[in-house]
């Protein structure tokens, strides 16, 4: 729902997941689901935030929220900081050649400034009072920007400043799950997960973009606990694109649904969600471990990926193009012997697959094969 977030809509989304998805295989192995408020939650009162968290808990969900600790979106230098009224925003900006550092429409703030620590303390206290257990920290790169100087004179580089600020975040938010977005890869010890592809939506180009990040960043789930490939949107796309988008999520790490599931949200999006977000065989793959590209030596997004999971091997092939394509499963490249007999099933269609024959993938679609 992007910038249309309201308190009633948030409750409706929680209820939609409870009534339509959680009882139909869209949940973690412990039966939990995370419901996150994104940008816009600050229009809620504290009582509404607490009520939202309580609704999530009643629905068997864990509530999440959003914050951008190292940015000033207002860019009003003379404004007073709400959580540190002895300072104005001009006091906390990072300056380069005497000018505020600006990126993506926001000014970067100094992670070492005491006013920023005061904001962290008060924001974490608010989130904790309300009961939030998950925080998406966005636009983190602002905290790593270079500057003429920092409040703390011992800091000499942007990454030093970022590391200082992240240590403070860990101090105040260390009992919550932290998901980083638009952030440096390192230092990595302050968060559980990191988004490796941002603003991915509903089309096959979004799948290709996501898989480009996985092609060359699959290993980052060895650094963080999970890779996050951003949300999956289903409305206004073909069903093949829906399958491809969902597959791109389950083989990356975090599996996030992004349509508007409030009562006024897209009917098509809800129908597609109940159809495609509830495939038990597909959803069981989403255990937070990234697939690896089979080749990984090109300059574009790879389209074939695999993961060995005990005695089960998963093989995925995407078709990013408009026309159908045929592919022979590269048995040797995925560690299989041509002479061995294997059972193979395509998980979206449920069809049995003969691995000795070419597989046809329609345009803007995917084949997700389980081999046992």
List each model region and its residues.
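The substrate-binding groove and active-site-proximal loops of carbohydrate-active enzymes
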Residues: 1-9, 34-46, 102-118, 141, ...
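An active-site-proximal structural segment forming one wall of the substrate-binding cleft
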Residues: 20-25, 111-139
